[in-house]
Amino acid sequence: MKYAAFKLAGVALSLSLAWSSAQADTLRIAADPVPHAEILNYVKKLDPKLDITVVELTSGANANELLANGDVDANYFQHVPYLKDQEKALGKTFAVAATVHIEPLGIYSRKYKDFKDVPEKATVAVPNNATNLSRALFLLQSQGLIKLSAQFTDPASTLATPKDIAENPKQLKILEVESPQIPRSLDDVDLAVINGNYALEAGLSPAKDALGLESADHNPYANILVTNPNLANDPRIKALAKDLTSPQVAEFIRKTYNGSVIPVSPQS
């Protein structure tokens, strides 16, 4: 009986170790539901040998904190300027494993069809985090709604705030709002500057519904796969990066999102 019990215990331990080993081989990737998780789920079908678990982010979750704490192995939801801001805020250094796609920032309205119809003192909802706030102001400038101070010429290297608006001919009122909440504010504001992923989640088509849209040319806000430096050369991360930048994934992005999400140049 003692031998049988010992043998059963040994089997249980072996199964436990095997399960732990299998878990260790699984990559946990934190991602926004749209389009990031959808793209990752396509990768799972494209490359069944790559074992990944997609952890969809809920409102308020910080995927960089999850990564820093080891709760996930990588994340896929952000662009480089936001990542740099997060590295400063968290006192951490991360590694970019792949550059995948661009989600052009857009200006939306349920009240107006053309910027010329926007009245004076109209309200404009913009993201409240530093990088996307600056990005929104540069977009408003590109549409002729405001003008920033002369030193703000490069959105990739300078962060503008509402205090840096030099000209505001319509006296627009800039309202800083949590990015995921902005689509819900569309009925309450005159204009809303919305990130591509949140626009898609809200059922908007950036390519069709936006009054003004960022150009994809030389856009510094490409979305990236990010990991910890100690995993940067992990074969699983490298395999995922290769899949995400493959021609097959680029074609999936083009067909699925019809210009609302734009793949970067894929690897051959």
Regions found by a protein language model. Give the residues of each.
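Short, polar/charged alpha-helical segment
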Residues: T26, A30-T53, N62
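Beta->alpha turn/N-cap motifs
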Residues: V34, T58-G60, N75-K84, H101, ...
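Short helix-initiation/N-cap motifs at beta->coil->alpha
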Residues: V55-E65, F152-R184
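Pocket-flanking alpha-helical
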Residues: G60-G91, I107, K113, A199-G203
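Ligand-binding "clamshell"
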Residues: D85-A97, R110-Y112, L186-D188, V193, ...
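A conserved helix-loop-strand patch within extracytoplasmic ligand-binding domains
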Residues: A97-K147, A250
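Periplasmic-binding protein-like
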Residues: A98-S109, S134-Q141, L200-K242, L244-S268
